[in-house]
């Protein structure tokens, strides 16, 4: 059973204890329960800080972590299958799997985005190792990667460059958009990116606490604010947007209009609680997998029957079309921790 979400956020730059936010609302508690000790790690292995997680077409789960093996495959029952990509990674960050079951990693230590086949062989390198953004096609601590319906590659070049970079399916640079800032089309740490079936690009503008939505050419369409801190985004087959909120340590489901449909989770160290909910993935049976950074673990949450309970007090989403919101972005903390 999940406890109600706390009013006090588990985030250094968020609302102070005792502060009140008139936008807070109660929403349905999503029907998920934690599956304790789902992953059976090899003897002697501790995950360390966890970062990325993804699921392939067979339901196998791939975990990206900051201890060896940094990239590992587990079957649908949580049993270890193999380690992959030994020696390829510096500081693992994001992990995605494309329609052909290729693995894509973002590494904010080496400034690289890698495409690997299911056996861990390198197929494509974007960026240049240990080189920041000296050219349009280079990155400065890239955070996440996503794919368009025609194979386009979108990189959230997050920690250093505050932009989105677009490549064609073969890795040729096409364009980029965004810069550091608070306005429309600007970012304060674009930490995650996802693309829906219509080609719209969703960017989790983490420290501005919003999701900005663009067309495939980077033209601004709208934004959703008041949703917390978007650390990771996943778009489900029904086109709902799922978000890890690493500031309040919860999982949120939104519809295509930006309405919050439900949430679950809370900050803490017990099973089912989280400390920096980073990235997430959804399995074919609707199990949700979460990289729980500071707890040094990956957690699995199984879907259950609806409970009818409410997950109390999360920010209400507000959608803006083509204009900036009238909220105090300038008051936000701008020192960005690497997480």
Segments predicted by a language model, with ranges:
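Bacterial N-terminal signal peptides
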Residues: 1-9
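Eukaryotic scaffold repeat domains enriched in small/polar residues
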Residues: 15-339
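Hydrophobic single-pass membrane-insertion segments
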Residues: 11-13
């Amino acid at each position: 059973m999940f406890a109600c979400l706390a009013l006090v956020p588990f985030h250094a730059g968020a609302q102070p204890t005792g502060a009140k936010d008139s936008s807070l609302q109660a929403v349905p508690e999503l029907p998920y329960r934690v599956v304790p000790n789902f992953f059976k790690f090899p003897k002697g292995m501790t995950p360390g800080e966890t970062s990325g997680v993804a699921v392939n077409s067979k339901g196998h789960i791939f975990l990206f972590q900051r201890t060896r093996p940094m990239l590992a495959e587990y079957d649908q029952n949580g049993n270890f299958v193999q380690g992959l990509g030994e020696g390829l990674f510096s500081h693992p960050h994001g992990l995605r799997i494309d329609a052909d079951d290729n693995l894509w990693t973002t590494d904010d230590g080496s400034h690289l985005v890698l495409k690997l086949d299911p056996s861990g062989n390198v197929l494509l390198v974007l960026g240049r190792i240990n080189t920041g953004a000296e050219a349009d096609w280079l990155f400065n601590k890239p955070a996440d990667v996503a794919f368009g319906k025609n194979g386009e590659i979108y990189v959230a070049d997050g920690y250093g460059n505050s932009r989105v970079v677009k490549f064609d399916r073969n890795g040729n640079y096409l364009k980029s958009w965004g810069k550091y800032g608070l306005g429309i089309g600007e970012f304060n740490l674009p930490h995650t990116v996802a693309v829906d079936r219509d080609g719209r690009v969703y960017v989790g503008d983490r420290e501005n606490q919003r999701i900005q939505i663009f067309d495939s050419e980077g033209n601004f369409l709208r934004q959703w604010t008041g949703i917390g801190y978007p650390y990771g985004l996943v778009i489900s087959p029904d086109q709902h947007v799922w978000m890890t909120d690493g500031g309040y340590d919860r999982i949120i489901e939104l519809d295509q209009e930006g309405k919050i449909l439900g949430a679950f989770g809370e900050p803490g160290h017990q099973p089912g609680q989280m400390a920096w909910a980073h990235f997430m993935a959804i399995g074919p049976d609707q199990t949700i997998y979460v990289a729980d950074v500071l707890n040094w673990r990956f957690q699995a949450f199984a879907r259950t029957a609806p409970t009818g309970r409410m997950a109390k007090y999360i920010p209400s989403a507000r959608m803006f079309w083509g204009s900036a919101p009238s909220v105090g972005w300038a008051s936000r903390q701008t020192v960005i921790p690497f997480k």
